[in-house]
């Protein structure tokens, strides 16, 4: 049993089936990727895990507890944090203030310790800690979104398309950060369209197509599947 166990998860939008019979396991300390083409159901799966959507059937167990259909605020209290595709920063608040919001449930001492850790992990944020989030570049804003999610010290961090819309050099920065978080023992489940980079960083990955899991394995195993890239991922 992993820190997150999803069994036969299905989600529908009215009569449209978006996710069908999806089963995923995330072990503690693992970096797990969820890859596939647009419309595969990756973001919908992540939304159901985080409590943003209620599944039609199947189960979600987080830290050994049944959390199927639990709301996002409860998932946060249980130790799950989400970095959404659209970063949703408080644009008029400074970098530091955004971090404080992320650590709202921690004590003052814990918040300051975590801010210090965030600045160690994201040096660019320390130099811009008084800057309003709305004035950050895309790469800086993505780093702030990740840092803010880490302020709750989650046992599982979910990321939805963390490299989306970033220049190639910034994509490298994001994946170097993901690799570092993995080396530090963080547990991550990441939805990502950049399949090659995700598989290089992942301990394990799942490939989705048309709402279903069509392949799974270690990152290295899936990188060797040329047929998989051509048929399911589109040669990314």
What are these regions (language model features)?
Residues 14, 70, 95-113, 121-123, ...:
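ABC-type ATPase nucleotide-binding domains, specifically the catalytic core motifs of the NBD
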Residues 35-37:
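The feature captures the beta-strand-to-loop junction immediately N-terminal to the Walker
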Residues 50:
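Helix-to-loop junction immediately C-terminal to a conserved catalytic motif
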Residues 58-66, 78, 111-113, 117:
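Conserved ABC transporter NBD signature motif
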Residues 132-136, 140:
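Conserved ABC ATPase signature
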Residues 149-150:
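ABC ATPase C-loop
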